[in-house]
Amino acid sequence: MVDAAVMSRGRKVGAKRQKAVDPGFLLLPLLVLLLLVFVAPTLWFFFNSLRETGQSLPEVMRAIQSVLFSSTIRDAIIKTNWISLVVTLVALVIAYPIAYAMSRSRGLALTLMVICIVLPYFTSIIVRTYSWMVILGRNGLVNEVLLQLGLISSPLQLMYNTSGVVIGMTYVLLPYLVLTLYASMKSIDDRLLHAARSLGASGFYTFRRIYLPLTLHGVFSGCLIVFILSIGFFITPALMGGPQDMMIAMLIEREVELTLNWPLASIMSLFLLAITLVLYAVYYRFSNLQKMMG
């Protein structure tokens, strides 16, 4: 009896200690890792580039400010956000029915669908991008099929423009959204849908009032992931886009490799990092609201 009482008291003390631990402390190792991997190298890059210029900080900042407010940078920022938004919306339209089909599949069908989604990630992104360049070229598969069907009289220009960038980026980023939506849809209790149908609700009404609201958290999370990855994309826009499709990552590469303007490149890198942190803060706030609302 005494041993049982001591063990029970020990469990209660252990439980109190566990409750007393702030969950924020559990994130400290991850935050330290992120600071060392992302923030510290960017800051080092910025201050080291300032030291190599031999100019004072105010002089460099004035020069950078004049460049940042130039039409080139402004157009790149607008273009980056616009392409990222279009890619996110197109990926959502394609990913939602795919994720829904996966959530309703079982056995071999589900396994094959997951393999088709994940398998491309075992191939280099450069190889996948070049594959799409071959498919979308003037003599590529798409134009050949359309010409054979008589739908077009001359090959379409699907490469080296915004359309090519959107197609290539959507293909690369689509699995992120599909898997996020699949996880969200898989957690929905099917009994809710059966109950709605048994009470006389139509399939469309059940989807609109029950199924879709329950998947909005996954939609928001997946779209945020795709948008964040899109704003920092480099390889696909560089290979499949044209001169008018200059994105922020491509400008950073140009400033580092061609003009050797490292301070400006580091400022734009910090700008990208700030956008990412803001978007993650929005997602964190949204997640907390979802938990509070049940």
What residue spans do the PLM features occupy?
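Short, Lys/Arg-rich, polar N-terminal cytosolic tail immediately upstream
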Residues: 1-19
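Membrane-water interface segments at the C-terminal ends of transmembrane alpha-helices
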Residues: 19-54, 70-186, 210-234, 239-241, ...
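Short hydrophobic, aromatic-rich alpha-helical segments embedded in or entering the lipid bilayer
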Residues: 55-69, 144, 243-255
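Polytopic alpha-helical membrane proteins, predominantly small-molecule transporters/carriers
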Residues: 57-58, 200-202, 207
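Short glycine/proline-centered loop/turn elements that form peptide/ligand docking sites
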Residues: 188-192, 292
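The alpha-helix within a helix-turn-helix
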Residues: 196
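Glycine/proline-centered hinge or cleavage motifs at structural transition points of membrane proteins
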Residues: 199-200, 213
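Short cytosolic juxtamembrane segments of multi-pass membrane proteins
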Residues: 286-294
